[in-house]
C-alpha cells in the first residue's frame, strides 16, 4: 500500500479565522499536522509516503516521506498529480486536515486494505459525526458498498465522507481520465458510484476536518484528552 497526503489547498477558512500558519504546518497535539500524518502512515505500514504540498510552503518532513510541490485548482487535480508520482499499486490517501486518534487510523487502514483486496475499486472513510460546512453524504447497502453520494442529507442513518480514501489501480486510472472533465473530488467519487464500480465504506466514530480555528481547538482537546475521556 502506497501512502499519499494531499495538502494542495490554500487554507483560506483557517486564514479568515486569523490562523496565519499554512494548514499543513498547523500544530495538533504539539506537532505540525503533516508530520502527524506522515508518522501515522509510516506506523500503518505504507511502503511509500508522498506529500503533495501547495507551492510556496516549505515543509521539513521526517523519514522517507517525499514532498512534491503543486499548484492545482482542486483536490481532485492534486490527487491526480499525486497519483502520477506515487509508485504502482493500491493507495491509501488522506487530506492533510484529517484528524483521528491512532486506533481509528489503524481500524480504517485495516478496513481499506481488506476491502481493496476483496475487489473494491475504491474505499471511503465514513462517519456519523457531521460537523462540516459542506458535508458529502453517503448511503450504503447491507454489505457496506456505497449506493449514492449526495450534497444534501438523504434518509437516515446519516453518514458523511471523512477525507480518507483507498484507491485501487483501476481507480487511479479512472481518476486520470475523469480530471479532464470533473473539477471536484466529490464529483469523482459520485462518478465511481454511478458507474456501479464497487465502492466500499469503512466507518469510524468521528473525524475532524481542520477547516476553522474551532476545529483546531476541538482536535487539540480530543487528541490530548486522558484515555477514556475523549469527546
Residue map of PLM features:
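N-terminal glycine-rich phosphate-binding loop and ensuing alpha1 helix
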Residues: 1-58, 106-111
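Residues at the starts of beta-strands that form the adenosine-phosphate
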Residues: 2, 47-49, 90, 121-122, ...
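Active-site glycine-centered loops adjacent to acidic/histidine catalytic or metal-binding residues
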Residues: 9, 97, 212
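Short, well-ordered beta-strand micro-motif
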Residues: 27, 85, 139, 166-168, ...
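Well-ordered alpha-helical segments embedded in enzymatic catalytic cores
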Residues: 33-36, 78-81, 187-188
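Conserved beta-loop-beta/alpha segment of the NTase-like Rossmann-fold superfamily
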Residues: 58-142
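Catalytic-core segments of class I nucleotidyltransferases/pyrophosphorylases
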Residues: 92, 106, 145-231
